[in-house]
Structure formats: C-alpha cells, structure tokens
UniProtKB/Swiss-Prot annotation:
SUPFAM superfamilies (alphabetical): 1-deoxy-D-xylulose-5-phosphate reductoisomerase, C-terminal domain, Glyceraldehyde-3-phosphate dehydrogenase-like, C-terminal domain, NAD(P)-binding Rossmann-fold domains
Listed cofactors: Mg(2+); Mn(2+)
Molecular function per GO: 1-deoxy-D-xylulose-5-phosphate reductoisomerase activity; manganese ion binding; NADPH binding
Family: Belongs to the DXR family.
Keywords assigned: Isoprene biosynthesis, Manganese, Metal-binding, NADP, Oxidoreductase
Name of the featured protein: 1-deoxy-D-xylulose 5-phosphate reductoisomerase
Protein purpose: Catalyzes the NADPH-dependent rearrangement and reduction of 1-deoxy-D-xylulose-5-phosphate (DXP) to 2-C-methyl-D-erythritol 4-phosphate (MEP).
Residues binding NADPH, per UniProt: T11, G12, S13, I14, Q39, N117, E119, G199
Organism the protein comes from: Thermomicrobium roseum (strain ATCC 27502 / DSM 5159 / P-2)
Amino acid sequence: MRLGVSLLGSTGSIGRQTLEVVAAHPDRFRVVALAARSQIDALQEQVRIFRPELVAIAQESLGISFPDTRVVSGPGGLVEAATYETADIVVIALSGNSGIEPTLAAAAAGKTIALANKESVVCAGPLLRDIQSRTGCQVRPVDSEHSALWQLLQLPHRPAEIARVILTASGGPFRDRPLEHLNQVTPDEALAHPTWRMGPKITIDSATLLNKGLELIEAHWLFDLPFERLDVVIHPQSIVHALLAFVDGTTVAHAAYPDMRLPIQYALFYPERVASTVPPLDLARIGPLEFFPPDTERFPALPLAREVGIAGSTYPTVLCAADEIAVEAFLAGQIRFTEIVPLIRSVLDRHQPASEPLTLEAILAADRWARSVARELVGRAIRHA
C-alpha cells in the first residue's frame, strides 16, 4: 500500500529533497497535498509531476495558477493541508513560526508528522507534548542531529544510564575567523556553509550557532531530556551528528555523510531501513575527525538559547521571531553580522512573558510583539548607521 504524503514547504530546500526521496520510491508513497508560500513556478512544476489532490498557497489570487487542482490559501490552507484526510504522513518543512499552527493541527488530528520545523517544538513544545499524550500522534524528527539522536535513543537503555547527550555543530564558515573581523562579514560569506545545503535563514542561524541553540531546546522537548545533560561540540567535518554518553564511560555515536535525504528517508520509512542513493560512509577516505568545545565569545547565541530554553514560557517564541527579523535585516544589509545576537537579546530583555499555562494564542501574540519590537530596533540601527 502506498502512503499518502502531505508536504508543507514543498519549494524549500527540505521540501525539494523530500520530493526527491518520494520520487525514488513511487511504489511506497504518493503526494496528496503540497503547500508553499512562494516560488509559484517551482510549485507548478511539482504539481505537474506529482499531481496532488490539494494545493495550499499563501495568496488566494495565485490560485489561478493551478486550474486543475483544488486550491486553498492562507494560514487556514496550511492547516487544511496538515490535516488532509488522505495524508498518512505530514511533512512540515516550513521555515519559521508559520509551521507552529499546522504542526499542532496535524498532531491534534493524530497524523504521523515528519517534522523539519524547529519553531513548532522550540516555541510550542509543551503544547505539542500535551496533544501527543491525548492523540498518540508520532513526531519523527527530520533535523539531522535529532534524527541521529532519535536513532541512538532506540538503543536498549534506562534513562538514568544516560550521562550526556551531545549534538554536533560544524561551526559554520566563521569558526576560525579572527573575532575582530566578524563585524565585516557579508551576507554572501555567511551563506557559504562549508558542509550543508540549506535555505538562507537556517544557513545564517548556523553561522551564528543559534540554530544549534534552538536544537538544544528542541531535543529537550522531543526526547524529555533535561538541559543539564545536553551539550554541543564543534565538529567541522559534519560526519558525526549526535553522541550518547552513558554513566559507565561508554559513548555511542551516529555517523553519516551530511545529506538531508538520509534523515528525510528515515522519517518517511520508519521503522524500516531501505537502500539510499547516498553512498555508505567510508571513514578511511574521510580521514581525521575533529571535535572542539564551542567558543561562547564567538558564538554568544548558543548560551543565550540555552538560557531561553530554561526560562521557557513565551521566551523561545520571542527568540525565534526576533531572530527572523534580525536575519532578514542582515541579509538586506541593514545590520552587521555581529549585531544579530545583540538585537535578539535586546528584544528578549524587553519581554514580559505570558502567564501560565502556555497557549497558542499567547505564542502568536508574543510572536507579533517580538517582530514589531525587532523591526523598531532595526529601524533605529539604520538611522544611526
């Protein structure tokens, strides 16, 4: 039987690679819904090839581009695609906070979710966990590090036997650049990630290491891991993706070439493993593997994200929203690379968190507030430049 796949964020980097995996296994999967916010030409080509039953787009006026397919639009369209009746697996590959509501809707509908949207867990982790406990939905992480950790945690063990959980980070393109030169970094330089092929937002987050900080928060909620057991190491080769250290001194590692098709395929096929077009790992050809502690002076976003994760409430939402605005401003040449994290911290310092318990409405309100404040701070930076 072929499983129906609903793919949200189909024209982005993860979305395109998901369709590569699906296309390689036409006997196992069929695309029943596609959703995208932009790149309509690319979406039209995807619709022509995969012939989904439903297409969700940002603007209703663009529906004329798909005359032979049922079209829905706006945030409600994303939710409809995420809960589509014939979808067995919902792949959430949206970038940013737009992924939160459809992820929660898919979970409430009891769908199996292949999740590549960090914000759904970082901002709404408590809500997602609560819905999972009620519906029994399965969330399969697509991020390479969390996929690796998910696989490691399936090894026989008792929770008390875990001493440390370690996520790796490449260190991005500036891990060796002199600190005094970081304020001269250009957007093109920051977008040149040494190992991964990703979209622009996550590539900049990888350069600041905020991405890894968000992954610490994500690991906390996905796997119920306390922050004091979560660590990060710099691993420039991006071959080892996660490590599990046990109390007896043993450490097990997950290693693979840095290719997103591997975690995508694992999430789609789980618990089955099938042959991949990615070559098997050849450690002899790779040569030395290096590991270093992160330099928090170079990467202040990492301890900031940990601090935010521990604080909880709507602080993670403010972190993510302010980061989106700061990254947009950097890519537009409005602020320096070294101003990204200070701008985010300034927004966090102004935030008054929502009262408990956390709600979707509080998350969305905090998101709007943080974006407004971040834009105001960007405007001030431009005026004083």
